[in-house]
Amino acid sequence: LPYPVNCKTECECVMCGLGIICKQCYYQQ
């Protein structure tokens, strides 16, 4: 799935509350 441009990587995008926010990955792919 596409992710917000302010996210460096797809795994940084995390669903939170009403939308998607950027967070660090808790794991490596």
Curated annotation (Swiss-Prot):
InterPro entries: Scorpion_toxin-like_sf (IPR036574)
Keyword Secreted assigned: yes
Post-translational modification: Contains 3 disulfide bonds.
Tissue: Expressed by the venom gland.
Cysteines joined through disulfide linkages: none
Locations listed in the record: Secreted
GO terms for cellular component: extracellular region
Superkingdom per UniProt: Eukaryota
Keyword annotations: Disulfide bond, Secreted
Keyword Secreted: yes
Other comments on record: Negative results: does not show any effect on Na(+), Ca(2+) currents, nor on voltage-gated and calcium-activated potassium channels.
Protein name listed in UniProt: Neurotoxin BmK A3-6
Species in which this protein is naturally found: Olivierus martensii
